A protein has these predicted regions:
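N-terminal auxiliary segments of SAM/dcSAM-dependent transferases
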Residues: 1-37
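Single conserved hydrophobic/aromatic residue that forms the stacking wall/gate
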Residues: 123-137
Length: 137
């Protein structure tokens, strides 16, 4: 499965490869508790969710120190894959549904992503000054 990511992002470091490989098991575990990815779609996780999330990186790479706000992050797409790809940028994943943020938190902790914050709030109550990035919301 990592071969699909490698095809488009051949310069991944060993730790990044490990994090991308670990995504499947982490999301599989969380998805049994909180359905954030369609069960019929889950086998296509890397193509339909991870690679799709990373597509923005080809046209908008995030510089070291960049701060990115993902509003309506759902289960962590695109925040989680982008936080892996850009470890020097800082991401904040926001969703109004607490159980989705719980998934993002569990996945981020499982991957050791120190550059990804999570917030369960509504946009109109969030006063972040971070850049917004396109999201599935």
């Amino acid at each position: 499965m990592i071969a699909l990511i490698d095809k488009y992002f051949p310069d991944l470091t060993r730790p990044q490869r490990g994090q991308f490989e670990a995504l499947y098991a982490l999301y599989a575990d969380w998805n049994t508790k909180i359905n954030v990815i369609s069960r019929k779609d889950f086998d296509q996780l890397y193509l339909r969710h991870v690679l799709h999330s990373l597509s923005i990186a080809k046209v908008c790479p995030f510089a070291p120190g960049a701060r990115v706000l993902d509003v309506g992050c759902g289960g962590g797409f695109p925040s989680v894959p982008l936080a892996i790809l850009f470890p020097e940028a800082h991401f904040t994943a926001v969703d109004s549904i607490g159980k989705k943020i719980k998934v993002v938190q569990g996945v981020a902790e499982g991957l050791g992503l120190a550059n990804l914050d999570r917030k369960s709030t509504r946009l109109n109550s969030s006063h972040n000054r971070e850049s917004r990035m396109p999201s599935s919301a």
